[in-house]
Amino acid sequence: WDINSQRYAYDFLILDDSGKSCRGNFSNCDSYYCYGRTVLSPADGVVEEIRTDCEDSKIFSGKTDPLIRDIRGNYVLLRHTDLNNTESSPADCGQEYSLLAHLMPGSIQVKKGQRVRRGEPIAHCGNSGNSTEPHLHFQVQNGKSFYHSAGLPIHFEHVNVGPQPGYESYD
């Protein structure tokens, strides 16, 4: 991995029954099924950092733009904590962070220092940053720094995954 924090990262798209992520014009973000969809907080935590000043990237036939200022684009970084513990302050949170990146311009609904609960809307899926098409980049890391943290395995709950028509399953 070029960036250690991305070791266990996922890129989420929405595909139709034929395996396509887009209908119509492939160079238009609005044509992608996931574009503009609500992004939810993956777990309880505190908003540690946000970036909101990136426009959506142009879609270059599956290539990224090398001149992008921040590969994450618009993003929310959450530091996870037990929100049921009313005694703790944001500074008492643990060392597990979630990064949600490539968010739609103007869609971030949370502020730095805000407490969030799992399932709470935080933004909308976009195509900002180093992105070949609209999608949600999601990773968990052991520190605040994108470049100097290690990626952590992600535990999903209530997910049923099975082979879809036209796809093969591999172990």
Tell what function each PLM region has.
Residues 31-34, 102-110:
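Short alpha-helix capping/helix-loop boundary micro-motifs
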